[in-house]
Amino acid sequence: MIKLRLKRFGKKRETSFRLVACNSTSRRDGRPLQELGFYNPRTKETRLDTEALRTRLGQGAQPTDAVRTLLEKGGLLEKKVRPAEVLGKQKQEKERSAKKKDAAASETSE
């Protein structure tokens, strides 16, 4: 399976990443099949080869979570609602409804 992942490079404590397509069993800094972009987390600079990325995604390449976030910001993928976000929202809604019930109960008892 082909994965889209970040390949680390740069100086110590001044890292940058290349967005690469590679085999899922290869090492993080191993030889990639293709370089598809660049990301610098310090300056927030992002460069993406959109044609090559669309081709790889069309072939069934699976992006990692970090790469998916970059692609969503770049407009290549639709924003996906992750289960943790949904569970967090549901939990917040339950807490809000419980507070409303407690407030209503305390008002009626006074």
UniProtKB/Swiss-Prot annotation:
Gene3D superfamilies: 3.30.1320.10. It comes from the Bacteria. Coiled coil: none annotated. SUPFAM superfamilies: Ribosomal protein S16. Residues 81-104 have a biased composition (Basic and acidic residues). The keyword Cell division does not apply. One of its GO terms (biological process) is translation. Residues 81-110 are annotated as: Disordered. One of its GO terms (cellular component) is small ribosomal subunit. Keywords: Ribonucleoprotein, Ribosomal protein. GO terms for molecular function: structural constituent of ribosome. Pfam families: Ribosomal_S16. InterPro entries: Ribosomal_bS16, Ribosomal_bS16_CS, Ribosomal_bS16_dom_sf. Belongs to the bacterial ribosomal protein bS16 family. This is Small ribosomal subunit protein bS16. It comes from Prochlorococcus marinus (strain NATL2A). The gene is rpsP.
